[in-house]
Amino acid sequence: MTKRFWNIDLEEMMRAGVHFGHGTRKWNPRMAPYISAKRKGIHIINLTRTARFLSEACDLVFDAASRGKHFLIVGTKNKAADLVSRAAIRARCHYVNKKWLGGMLTNWSTTEKRLHKFRDLRTEQKTEGLNRLPKRDAAVLKRQFSHLETYLGGIKYMTGLPDIVIIIDQQEEYTALRECITLGIPTISLIDTNSNPDLADISIPANDDAIASIRFILNKLVFAICEGRSSYIQNS
């Protein structure tokens, strides 16, 4: 994998608050190598380490995108949800930003059936087929469609397991991470000072609560994916 320059600026990270960890009482001792100081009761993340692992993650997704690989971005908490959907749409990735349904990956056959149902209902909705049904039947199917759209809308074009999963807030998305580990799917995780850095393939230590911090990390990864996709198209 070729190392590239991704213009990851420490001052820009500081302005985004990437360096602010959780309170010192709420930490995982395994994060000690990624913490540079304590300040006013919170841990300060070592941004040099953040830059290093973010750069490695950008190299990985660029390389994967340049070979036509598929990505899934997961981030369901309120502060991350909109950022995740926008980033995924920009980079033409699949995403989950509402709720991780247990077994979404490990029980892929069931997820696939739900997706087929969702696509069928979506077609009916577009062609106004639901309006030709009796009102009660149409209402039931419309509710079902709305439910599926909420939870599966971001993966509606997924036809198989993703090649790489990007996780925003490892603690929040632990179930998704465990499924990836079970299936051997490479993972990139944004981890705060309360996380275990040894679980994901690449762990990026960063503030997972501040919108500006999440946006900074996602923007770098999305840029690398888009660059990789451009390379793939040029070489096809």
UniProtKB/Swiss-Prot annotation:
PROSITE patterns assigned to the protein according to its UniProt record, in alphabetical order: RIBOSOMAL_S2_1, RIBOSOMAL_S2_2
InterPro entries recorded: Ribosomal_uS2, Ribosomal_uS2_bac/mit/plastid, Ribosomal_uS2_CS, Ribosomal_uS2_flav_dom_sf
A Pfam family of this chain: Ribosomal_S2
Location(s) in or outside the cell: Plastid, Chloroplast
Keywords from the named record: Chloroplast, Plastid, Ribonucleoprotein, Ribosomal protein
Recorded superkingdom: Eukaryota
Ribosomal protein listed as a keyword: yes
GO CC, one annotated term: mitochondrial small ribosomal subunit
Family: Belongs to the universal ribosomal protein uS2 family.
UniProt cross-references to NCBIfam families, sorted A to Z: rpsB_bact
Identification of the protein by name: Small ribosomal subunit protein uS2c
